[in-house]
Amino acid sequence: MGPVAPGDSVIFLVGNFAAQHNGAVITCDSAVRYSDMRIEFFGNVLINKNTTYIYGDRAEYNGEVNEARVFSDIVKVVDEDATLYTYEFLFNTKENVGEFGGGGVLVNRDSRLESVRGYYYANSKELVCVDRVEMRNDEY
């Protein structure tokens, strides 16, 4: 998460932990608080804002730039009937915009959309896929 600034304290939070910023709630098994605006989350990480749910093993949150970077073997982003699977997901809790790189798969009903990179706009429920985009649907 980076160096600890002089004067900052580091607090280890063991046991179910929750934090809130910009209307997003982040829960996990344990956390390390580096400052008022920098927290690292471990184990069963869940970020929830409105209808968006982001699941991972670990997350780093920087409140100064309103960004949560979520890591896992498979990060899962669920918004109603659509689910995105990727390896790393960056979510801005103020703008409600996420992005992924390194590959992602969106599953929605009978469709499957794959791309190397993408941007997710939670307010409008839109996914913009970039770089080697492929869609699969039995009807097309």
What is the meaning of each model-derived region?
Residues 1-140:
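N-terminal amphipathic/hydrophobic interface segments
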